[in-house]
Swiss-Prot record:
Its main location: membrane. This is Low affinity ammonium transporter. The gene is AMF1. It holds the Pfam family MFS_1. One of its GO terms (cellular component) is membrane. GO terms for molecular function: ammonium channel activity. GO terms for biological process: ammonium transmembrane transport. CDD domains: MFS_Amf1_MDR_like. It comes from the Eukaryota.
Length: 515
């Protein structure tokens, strides 16, 4: 009996010591960083950090606009192979965000922000030089290129979050960060179209590499120095804090699962390795879940997740998968079906920058007067309406009818869903896991774009009669997007109703208590 008591007491002491260590680690995340002291310095500071979002979306736009120009240089016309130009990039952006955020927490956010831009610069340059190689090397460069934004986004958000206290200034800075996304996509599309059409497409990637190098150097100088988080090697192992086992199994599972979905339309699902990789990827994700449930410092703490988290992430996954389908096939529709040049198509997409900025400002106002669940419902509706408009647009219809309205509407889905989801997750998570909210949203956004393209590509390859009827394939892919965003509306409406009923119940209980 005494032996059992001593063992129990020893376990309690060990658990208490572990909790103290974890509290020490988590307290490091709450440190307030020094804000730049002058307006000029602060403007440069915010500009460099917002460039993380801008360059991330520019990386997506630079492959979509000159898609066929790049494909022709490699002798590629298959839609499934072309979709890899965008999906390989989004795959790694979504896969590595959680790991990048954890590394930033341990080794310093500024360090990994700067390294992210250097990495982005290197693989942008190599993507341009892939013109001398083949499409497979270009796809690999795009995948490695996407790891740069994966390190930029969570660390930029963490730096901003630690620098600004809650208030109007912080809301303004985060609104600017969100508004950079549509503008970044437009800039990437315009410059890559112009260079691809009038000069040589690799120049878009070489210029991107130079710009990222300049931003890396700028980030080193304009981001204030922050003290390195303390790491007591005698207290806990570094690999345990990084969650090495969870990171490896999670990355392998996500990559294999996504690769199978995007490669299936290219080689056909009857090819054995496609469904084999899908099964193996799922197996690794199951192992990842098992490891995370027992890890001391889990990359994805299941204890912090709730039914509210599932609702929010389901909405984001459905809406942004729909967005990925919309933007990829709208570009194909403009260039293939309507015979437009990449530069003209980019010009027609220019309203996304203005509409996105208006959406970001409006969302900031709505979130202070309307429940985030209602804003999320509006966002899912925007995704659905925008996709319906382009899916039913006749080929020879004027741009100013359905296409223009669709391009105006879709940024509202983008810029309303992201901040609403971040706030909703933040409200539903414990204080010590606040940094996880934005990282989770970013992960699901980018991974869903890539998966959505894989699902749509499978549908397109089944209905376009071997490429003889491309328009039929585009429309059926859009219909899939409508189904996904419609599912988002259903989930958002259910969540909004559930939130309303919970609020009503709390008010009723409070009144009953007062009486």
């Amino acid at each position: 009996m005494s032996t059992s008591s001593s063992v129990t007491q020893k376990n309690l002491d060990t658990n208490a010591e572990a909790l103290k260590k974890e509290d020490k680690v988590l307290s490091e995340f709450d440190i307030q960083d020094e804000r730049p002291k002058s307006l000029l310095w602060e403007s440069a500071f915010v500009g460099v950090l917002c460039s993380a979002q801008l360059m991330t979306q520019a990386g997506l736009g630079q492959s979509l606009a000159p898609l066929h120009i790049i494909g022709n240089s490699f002798g590629t016309t298959n839609a499934g192979q072309l979709s890899w130009f965008a999906s390989a990039y989004s795959l790694t952006v979504g896969t590595f965000i959680l790991i990048a955020g954890r590394l930033g927490d341990i080794f310093g956010h500024k360090k990994f922000f700067v390294l992210g831009f250097f990495w982005y610069a290197l693989w942008s340059l190599l993507a341009g030089f892939s013109v001398y190689s083949n499409q497979i090397f270009f796809d690999c460069c795009r995948a490695f290129q996407g790891m740069g934004p994966a390190f930029l986004l969570p660390n930029a958000i963490a730096i901003l979050g630690r620098t600004y206290k809650p208030g109007r200034r912080k809301n303004m800075v985060f609104s600017l960060f969100g508004a950079s996304a549509p503008g970044g996509f437009f800039l990437g599309a315009v410059f890559s179209s112009m260079l691809g059409q009038l000069a040589w497409w690799p120049w878009a990637y070489w210029i991107m590499g130079i710009a990222c190098f300049v931003l890396a150097v700028a980030g080193y100088f304009v981001i204030p120095h922050t003290p390195m988080p303390s790491r007591d090697a005698s207290s806990f192992k570094l690999l345990e804090r990084i969650d090495f086992a969870g990171s490896v199994t999670g990355v392998v599972g996500l990559i294999l699962f996504n690769f199978a979905w995007n490669q299936g339309p290219v080689v056909g699902w009857q090819t054995p390795y496609t469904y084999a990789l899908l099964i193996v990827g799922t197996f690794f994700l199951v192992i990842f879940a098992y490891i995370e449930s027992r890890a001391a410092f889990p990359l994805l703490p299941f204890a912090a997740l709730s039914s509210d988290t599932a609702f929010v992430l389901s909405c984001i996954a459905a809406g942004w998968a729909s967005f990925g389908i919309w933007i990829f096939y709208t570009w194909q529709f403009m260039e293939d079906s309507r015979g437009q040049t990449p530069l003209l198509s980019s010009a027609q997409f220019s309203p996304v920058a203005i509409s996105g900025f208006c959406a970001a400002v409006t969302t900031g106002f709505l979130l202070s007067h309307t429940p985030p669940s209602t804003v999320m419902l509006f966002a899912m509706t925007a995704f659905t309406v925008g996709t319906i408009l382009i899916a039913t647009a006749p080929v020879h219809q004027t741009y100013w009818a359905q296409t223009f309205v669709s391009i105006i509407v879709m940024p509202w889905g983008m810029d309303m869903s992201f901040p609403a989801a971040t706030i909703m997750l933040s409200d539903s998570m414990p204080h010590e896991h606040q940094g996880l909210a934005a990282s989770l949203v970013n992960t699901v956004v980018n991974y869903s774009i890539s998966i959505g393209l894989g699902i749509a590509g499978t549908i397109e390859s089944r209905v376009n009669d071997g490429g003889a009827k491309p328009l039929k394939g585009y429309r059926c892919s859009w219909y899939m997007g409508i189904g996904l965003s419609g599912l988002g509306i259903f989930v958002a409406a259910t969540y909004a109703w559930s939130t309303f009923m919970k609020s009503k119940k709390r008010i009723s209980e409070k009144q009953h208590f007062i009486e």
